[in-house]
């Protein structure tokens, strides 16, 4: 699950956000990148916590925190980002997205923009 969420963030930030930014969708993307940073840091904490031999109460807390973050984040994506993407993405961007979904891999060591120092 952690890797799938990271891959989802990569896909959005590298393939979806650039054409949306070029179309003038700046403020919503700023919010999305900031939220991606929070999600990324929660994923890192969760992965570190789960690397032990037992599941600690902090892991359960992090899972709950992640679920809440995702609920808020996804509602914005569904209402704002994805409808705009349907309107402004050129066919070439759609083709890149589909190709990545089919077999693309996130580059080793990639970190989302909102979690970079």
Where in the sequence are the language-model features?
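Small-residue-biased structural context
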Residues: 1-117
């Amino acid at each position: 699950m952690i890797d799938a969420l990271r891959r989802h963030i990569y896909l959005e930030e590298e393939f979806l956000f650039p054409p949306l930014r070029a179309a003038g969708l700046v403020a919503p993307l700023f919010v999305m990148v900031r939220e991606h940073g929070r999600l990324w840091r929660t994923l890192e904490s969760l992965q570190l916590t789960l690397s032990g031999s037992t599941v600690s109460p902090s892991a359960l807390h992090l899972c709950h925190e992640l679920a809440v973050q995702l609920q808020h984040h996804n509602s914005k994506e569904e209402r704002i980002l994805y409808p705009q993407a349907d309107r402004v993405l050129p066919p070439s961007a759609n083709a890149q997205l589909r190709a990545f979904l089919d077999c693309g891999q996130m580059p080793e060591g990639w970190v989302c923009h909102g979690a970079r120092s």
